[in-house]
C-alpha cells in the first residue's frame, strides 16, 4: 500500500537529493554531456526517466531541455506521494522488466532508495529478508495502456535490471534516438548482467555505443554509457 508523506521518515533526505542532483548520484560530467548533445542539435520533446527515484535526474534535465516533457517510471511505491507533492503527474509506479505478470522479490531500503532492485545489492545496506513481492510489467505494455507519447531520449538506472527492461521495450525503442544506460563492472547486484554482455545486447537492439563510461560516481562499480540509434546504411 502506498504511503503518505507522514509515513516516510526520510522525506527531508529525498527533498535534499532532488534539489541537489549533482551532489547525489548525477556527476557533473553526465550533465555536461547532455548539454553537449543539445549544442549538437538534439532537442527531445519527450524523455523517459526509468528508475526515477526522487526525480533528481528529471530536475537536472529540465535545466538542459526545459521544453521537454519527462515521464517518470519507478518501482518504489513510496515515491507516489513525493511525486504528487511536487505536482508531477506524468509518472508510473510499477516493476518494469522483460515480461508481464511475473512475481519478483523487490529488495528495498527506505533510507538508501537508489539501490532498490529485484537484483539484490551485494552490500550491508540490503537484506535478503526485506523485500516486496511485485508483479513485473514491460515498458511497452505500460506505455500502450497509458497512451503516452514515445520518447526520443531514455535513461535507465535500475541497479542491474536495465537490459531486462530494454528487452521489454522493443516498440518504445523504435523511437529512441539516444539511450543512457548505467552498466555494472562488478557483481554489485546479484545476478545482473555486467557491462560487456549488456553492451552486446543493446547493440543487438539497434544502438551503437558512442561514449563508454562517460560519467560515474565510482567507476570501479558502474558507469553511465551513451548509445545512439544506428543510422540506416
Give the ranges of each region predicted by the language model:
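Phosphate/nucleotide-binding beta-alpha loop and adjacent structural elements of enzyme active sites
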Residues: 1-233
Amino acid at each position: 500500500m502506498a504511503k503518505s508523506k507522514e509515513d516516510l521518515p526520510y522525506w527531508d533526505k529525498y527533498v535534499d537529493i532532488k534539489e541537489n542532483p549533482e551532489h547525489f548520484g548525477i556527476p557533473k560530467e553526465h550533465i555536461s554531456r547532455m548539454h553537449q548533445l543539445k549544442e549538437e542539435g538534439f532537442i527531445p520533446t519527450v524523455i523517459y526517466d526509468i528508475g526515477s527515484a526522487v526525480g533528481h535526474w528529471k530536475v537536472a534535465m529540465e535545466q538542459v531541455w526545459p521544453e521537454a516533457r519527462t515521464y517518470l517510471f519507478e518501482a518504489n511505491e513510496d515515491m507516489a506521494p513525493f511525486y504528487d507533492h511536487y505536482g508531477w503527474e506524468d509518472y508510473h509506479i510499477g516493476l518494469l522488466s522483460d515480461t508481464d505478470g511475473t512475481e519478483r522479490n523487490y529488495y528495498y531500503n527506505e533510507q538508501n532508495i537508489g539501490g532498490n532492485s529485484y537484483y539484490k545489492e551485494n552490500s550491508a545496506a540490503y537484506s535478503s529478508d526485506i523485500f516486496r513481492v511485485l508483479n513485473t510489467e514491460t515498458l511497452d505494455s505500460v506505455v500502450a495502456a497509458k497512451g503516452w507519447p514515445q520518447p526520443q531520449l531514455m535513461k535507465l538506472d535500475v541497479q542491474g535490471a536495465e537490459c531486462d527492461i530494454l528487452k521489454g521495450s522493443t516498440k518504445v525503442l523504435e523511437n529512441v534516438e539516444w539511450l543512457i544506460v548505467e552498466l555494472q563492472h562488478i557483481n554489485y547486484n546479484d545476478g545482473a548482467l555486467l557491462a560487456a554482455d549488456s553492451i552486446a545486447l543493446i547493440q543487438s537492439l539497434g544502438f551503437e555505443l558512442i561514449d563508454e563510461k562517460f560519467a560515474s560516481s565510482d567507476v570501479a562499480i558502474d558507469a553511465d554509457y551513451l548509445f545512439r540509434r544506428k543510422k540506416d546504411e
